[in-house]
Each structure stands twice: as C-alpha cells, then as structure tokens.
A protein has these predicted regions:
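Nuclease-adjacent, charged terminal/linker segments that flank catalytic cores
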Residues: 1-97, 310-314, 318-334
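Hydrophobic transmembrane signal anchors and adjacent membrane-proximal interface regions, especially
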Residues: 3, 36, 50, 85-89, ...
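Polar/charged alpha-helical tracts
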Residues: 14-21, 25-32, 37-40, 89, ...
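Alpha-helix boundary/N-cap detector
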Residues: 22, 63, 67, 71, ...
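Acidic-basic catalytic patches of nuclease active cores, encompassing PD-(D/E)XK
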Residues: 48-157
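Catalytic cores of nucleic-acid endonucleases
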Residues: 136-142, 150-153, 159-168, 188-266
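Active-site beta-strand-loop-beta-strand hairpin of nuclease catalytic cores
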Residues: 165-167, 174-186
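Non-catalytic C-terminal interaction segments of nucleic acid-processing enzymes
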Residues: 251-334
Length: 334
C-alpha cells in the first residue's frame, strides 16, 4: 500500500496572489510567442520591456493555448496542489513511480523553441528515461530531443525517432518524477476537442468543463490518460482571470485598463503591479512578481507500507493509494 503524506508549507493564497502567480507564466508565454526577427530588432528577449509588448505582439488564435501550457508547467513546478495532485495521479495511471512531480517545457513549435530545447537538455540527465507505454525497454529521452525538434520542422517526416515514440515531436511538456528521472510525453490543449494521441505521448492535459466531472480517465481511442485541470474556484478559473488581466493590460497600452474592462478589484490590483513595472524588461518583471505570488504550498513524502495478511505480511502493493487527512494536535498532551 502506498502512503502519501502531504504537509502544507504555506497558507492558501488570497485572490490577488493567486492571480499574480498565473500572470507570470502568461507573460512568459507571450514573450516566447514573439517572432524571432521582431525580438532581435528589440534587442533580444532579455531586453524586451513590458511597455513594448503591446506593440510587438500580434494576437493570434493560439495565444491562449500557449499560455495555458506555460501556466500548467509553472503550477507543477510551484507545487500548486490542485495541479500537482492531478499530475501525480495521472502519472500513477501511466505506472510512473516517484515522489517529486516535475515538468519540463519542450514546445518545439513555439517561437524561441531552441532555447526551450536547450533548457530541456540541461534539465535531463543521461539516465532520464521516457516511458512510452509500449513493450520493451524505456528509451533514453535526452538522446532523442534533437530528433524530436527536427521532426517538428519536417512535420514528422524522416525524423529518425523510433516507431514507438514517433509522435514525440508533438509533445508540449515532459511530466514525470525528478527523483526517479522518469518522464512521459504530454500534450496540452485548452480546447479538449483538439486533443489527439500519437506514439510517444501518454498524458493529455485539458481544462475541466465547468460544472462537470473532472476525474482522471484513460481514453482508449486516443491511448492517452486524460488529466483535466480543475475549474470551479480552482486553477482553470484563476487562469482565465489572469488571462483577462494580461489581455486588458496590453489592450490599454501597458497601462491600468478602464474599470469597465477590468471591474474586479483583485484583477485591477494585479494590473497596477504590471503598470508600475512597465519600464522594466519582461523577464525582470516576471521575476519580481514572484515575491507577490502564491508560494509553494505542499511538501510531499511517499512511502510503501506492508500489508498484514492472514498468514503473514507482504510488501506487494495490493492497493494503489489511500488519501486521508493527517491530524495535528496543537497545545495537546496527546
């Protein structure tokens, strides 16, 4: 039996802090969606000031999806409980074992993708394995990154990728456990109708539909474990509030929007955070907002417990996991 002990490190954030936390990856996503030639004329991504974003950015239909992907990645890295718990359970469905949930951006189709690929190479080790779900030994992930990037540029033709992971170039993230260095290819779609399965992809991350079930499930037709991000009063709702702040701020030429464009007091507070920093580079603003964001919430410890059977004890896992509150006793002699 698996026992997972989660200890809360920090109190749950207020609305302003929660929105601020998600604004950061949205800004990152917009910055990296800028075309390379536009960025070069502005002095490189490190030099793009926040006030320049409205003029450099060309809004597109895929912007929300790109930023949702970055927000999911960031939430996993921050230990956002609603997201990390879902990812942990989805990985368990894929039989990926470990204690430390992690996320690595890949996104070969994004502008600035070479930097993302280079970053992924740094984060991975020679022992990092990709669990594709097919029979046979897991493949070493790092050695296939370059082939995956090349496959995107050729739309999958003559990629050099093994057949079992021939669709890896379509991955947006690698989700897994950093302590066991085990990863799975993951596709992220803000529109669930756009979710498709390919060899090498194991998990599909989508927003849960408002008011409907958000349970993790296996889709046999797509050969994907579907991992809906929670909506009502949770991650997806916060994402859309943060997206509203950023788009309204950019439409107002990097100033605080009119109240009719952003009527919620919490949202206007975050917009003021941005307006106060409009003369600074976007990368520095993202870093500065970190101090105002929701900090990491949970510390997770996982262990296996033996089962007492009639006739003896066994370490064979019969039950996947048990979830229950851990009591604390303040000022108690117990």
């Amino acid at each position: 039996m698996e026992i997972r002990n989660e200890r809360q490190l920090n109190p749950v954030a207020d609305e302003v802090s929660a929105i601020t936390a998600v604004v950061r990856p949205i800004l990152y996503g917009i910055l990296y969606s800028l075309k390379a030639e536009v960025v070069e004329e502005a002095g490189g991504r490190e030099g793009v000031k926040l006030r320049m974003l409205p003029r450099l950015r060309r809004p597109g239909s895929g912007d929300t999806g790109i930023c949702f992907e970055y927000a999911v990645h960031d939430a996993v890295r921050r230990g956002e409980p609603d997201v990390s718990e879902r990812v942990y359970d989805a990985l368990s469905h894929c039989r990926v074992r470990g204690n430390s949930v992690g996320s690595i951006l890949f996104g070969a189709e994004k502008a600035g993708s070479q930097q993302l690929i280079d970053t992924a190479e740094v984060l991975l080790t020679e022992d990092s394995v990709l669990l594709s779900g097919s029979r046979g030994r897991p493949v070493k992930l790092k050695r296939h990154l370059t082939s995956a990037a090349a496959a995107f540029r050729k739309k999958g033709a003559e990629s050099g990728l093994p057949q079992s992971i021939s669709g890896l170039w379509r991955a947006d993230l690698f989700l897994g456990h950093s302590d066991t260095d085990s990863w799975v290819g993951t596709t992220v779609k803000i529109n669930p109708l756009g979710l498709k399965g390919y060899p090498g992809l194991r998990i599909g991350v989508v927003p849960a539909s408002q008011g409907s079930s958000d349970g993790i499930r296996k889709d046999d037709t797509k050969n994907l474990v579907i991992c809906p991000m929670p909506y009502d009063g949770s991650f997806v709702e916060t994402f859309y509030m943060a997206w509203e702040v950023v788009t309204a701020f950019l439409e107002a030429d990097a100033q605080v929007p009119k109240e009719v464009s952003l009527p919620r007091p919490a949202a206007r507070t975050v917009a003021r955070y941005l307006a106060d920093r409009r003369e600074f580079p976007v990368v520095d603003v993202i870093d500065a907002l970190g101090a105002l964001s929701q900090p990491e919430l949970l510390q997770t410890q996982t262990l296996s417990a033996g089962l007492v059977l009639s006739g003896g004890k066994s370490d064979i896992v019969q039950t996947t996991s048990v979830l229950a509150p851990q009591p604390t006793f303040a000022n108690s002699s117990i």
